[in-house]
């Protein structure tokens, strides 16, 4: 058994030419590329979706040693978008019609042993293909290329094709195997290794699953994602005194856990879980789908650790095994679904969709994080015969998990186990999600909200303060109401990050600004809605995000706007200068009472100041403060109650105006300094200061500064932010940042990038060499900044 990574040494041709499959390929301009690869890098926005739609080709020459005689040579592609035909030495060997699943090609019969061989791939990423997700309009780009890793395996003629383990929380397990080749007389050996290193060995026959019970298991859960390792060996017993021979072995990670969906919600290992999830597209700026494993894993980190989500939906297709691996390790539940978007095609299209379902299940079913299969094309109309087949195919291959399918209409046919509903009903008032009983045709089955939020109310990072706040409160309202409504298992917000799209969608610049993060995964204000729901275990876990910059000139008429704080602290203290104003606690009976940590509205900017500076008694100060805060809220329009208070306190309008100018402020008033303190366990653990900007600094953060070149090229994700002297984002800074590198990395995308909403980013790819690298960043009006990286090469 030999394994080789095959991600270097490829040649790319932007148009497919039959000469690519021939032994000699002269006259073609071929570009050396490394995998993962995209057929066309696109600009950040205003891209042309036709640019990545092309019929192109890849070629790789290799030597096949004579020692491979009598062996089986298997070539595996992690994913090729979207229609791939593989040739070896001129022979057409394999065709694959899904851009989101892996496939394996047996090269054995076509090889020239002891000689040079030529492998060629015909890659078709045109959207007129009669395969999912194509056939209708699509609200995302689908890109093209060999965008996941490639590997070569040399095996015996008899080998293990697949291993699947069912493992329940109680410790019961069943191990299924599938083999290829002559296996008469062969046996199986299965070894389960715990995280602590203890081992249990079981033996079995090929015709039956290996069953058993492992005592004292630690179930996989969101809080404790315990992973076990299973190694299965295919053994040919020795004869005539010869020892047994291991023909093949396969290792998978898995977890002991039990998933149950009922009318009351989701139960994991018998404990109810309220899903607080997000939808994720696997696309990135410039590169589309073609990013290495490290960035796939980084997205899982953002979702679980930064946003505090416990679930993710891989909209609208199966995603990278590296992403699923990270979800397994982090305890992040995954709802993965068959490729497609609102369209169901003809019988040939459906046949490919069924095959996609089978491949999705077989390739993802050992991941304990996967708890739900999407057996329906997102948003598609009813098709009873077709969706009976998808559900049957999935349950046949994996009887342990329920199925769902994202519906966009009420009371559609429910052939799945769970009714998943894209609920975009909220318009800013009233209930934020529809009543479960009015949507699902069968209230005895499970129910969840598969999408909500960003599509209904997109927000650009550079939108004004009020717009960004409305999006954040929109997310908070639906999150709250999905928790409050009995029988709703939870929700998946739309979506993690902004993404490139077709001309029929988005904001006219080929971007859907639906994300709680931008394309570079910089957080918007709405990200704080999710992040603030985390349960803090240390001061560093405390989130404190203030919605307002407290800049009156940014607001219509200079009238102060709403100010909300998104925090998981116990309370928030407000100071004006050095003077304490008031302390605010979450409203456990208000609009967001169902949330673990409701956002806090800062509605008192006067507080105790009147007692200190106006000499008022406490009761009078409370009434006057109420008048001033109401005037702030209502654009200087006193209510009848405020007028009555003024009369009872013998306050004239000029008296009120004087105090308003002094304690609230108007356009042109001396700018005040506000300090917000997050209080946890009785002490201030995090502070935000709002005051006029005195200096601008360019912040450069490399999220993964240690890179490993191998088995593919690696990539660093870099975030850029313009911040003030207090570390606050400057949302209207749009300066250009000049980027320059030293060392063995290269910039993906332009070397000069603008900040959008005060934020930006870039990617740094390894070049096949080890060493230290430096990223130099220069922006007008700020000091230059640098970031350092370490690049290692895997042997």
Model-predicted segments: where are they?
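Short flexible loop/turn segments that cap and initiate beta-strands
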Residues: 186-189, 223-227, 560, 568, ...
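Beta-strand-rich binding/interaction modules
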Residues: 88, 172-204, 561-583, 674-678, ...
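Extended acidic/polar, glycine-enriched regions
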Residues: 112-116, 181-260
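Accessory beta-strand-rich segments of carbohydrate-active enzymes
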Residues: 3-16, 38, 48-49, 53-160, ...
